[in-house]
């Protein structure tokens, strides 16, 4: 609900930040990181957090969004929430596994920012890229930053490609 209020309060060129699905993943990352002592608990926390973001969005946008897009988000949203929550829980782990997980959500956010910068334009996408970089620094551990940066770079490319596919389908 907070995202919807934010979307309405921000000027048009910034309002996109309240409705970007990648930034919704940050909510799931935080839930998974804070509540997930094990990966499965992080996945459950992330899924729950994403459903909490998704239900108000679906309720508010049901009349103005094509049914195919609503169905897509009802399927993809909870799965993405579980993945982001699991990545949050795993990012707390020591070693390479935790470092690789730390790059997942920042990479997704960065990929969406690249897509927005290249195809949509506007200042919000530049800010989202800065948020992705900042999130990567905060989530990654000093000793494993190179692994985290590597996984984030791969996810940037994959997320940007997924955004392109999404646009071509809907």
Please provide the spans of the model-predicted regions:
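N-terminal topogenic module of multi-pass integral membrane proteins
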Residues: 1-58, 62
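Structural signature of hydrophobic alpha-helical transmembrane segments
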Residues: 10-23, 66-78, 119-130
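Alpha-helical transmembrane segments and their membrane-interface exit regions
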Residues: 25-27, 53-54, 77-84, 130-139, ...
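Cytoplasmic membrane-interface segments at the C-terminal ends of transmembrane helices
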Residues: 29-42, 84-101, 136-150
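Central hydrophobic cores of alpha-helical transmembrane segments
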Residues: 43-52, 101-109, 147-160
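Membrane-proximal helix-loop-helix units in multi-pass membrane proteins
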Residues: 55-120
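Alpha-helical membrane segments in multi-pass integral membrane proteins
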Residues: 98-142, 151-155
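Juxtamembrane boundary at the C-terminal end of a transmembrane helix
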Residues: 159-170
